Amino acid sequence: AGTCDQECENSSGGGDDNQYYTLVWSDEFDGDTIDESKWNFETGNGNWGWGNGEHQYYRQQNASIEDGKLVIEARNESFNGFDYTSTRMQTRNKGDWRYGKITASLKVPSAGGTWPAFWLMPTNSVYGGWPHSGEIDIMEHYGCNPGDVHATVHNTIFNWNGGTPPTSYSMYTSATSEFHEYTVEWTEDELSFSVDGNWIGSYYNENSGPEQWPYDQEFYIILNLAIGSHF
């Protein structure tokens, strides 16, 4: 996973070969343990299953480093009243950014009921609670549809309770068997999504206010593997 600050203007939608960045943060997971100067671990099941009806209990012990790769393992085991455990880790107050390029190389599980995600949430919800301060989903995958991978945004206008974000997509049948690079390039005007350098969609700032574009604040990275939901 890595993030870069922008050094020149983005002149076209996503994946532009003339785009230059300076690396400001990365984690190559090349140590023996996860670097807690970069990552926080969220625990428990949140409110109402993290708002989604998820079935797992998050804990740090389900994340490890193997052969230079981060592994998040969902387990079918009883723990604190739940039948599954997994990990949710994030960079809040250790890695927070406004604008730039954020990317990670990921391989997702193929088991039904799994819901891995690589996404961004606001460090400070200056426009109010979810969805008003925004959410940026760089990669989501549902194990019941192994050939589909999704990227999208959420805000006051576009959220699960109304509206369809224009950046949703489905592709990549090899998502569960190979690593792919999932990226968002974020400027004050555009969120541009790509997979392996291939542009797949953009969401644009229409200058109509934070209801449509709350993406002018700092966000942080989340990596997690959920089990089940009410979606």
Residue ranges of each PLM-predicted region?
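Primarily marks secretory-pathway-exposed extracellular/lumenal segments that are disulfide-
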Residues: 1-13
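GH16 jelly-roll
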Residues: 14-231
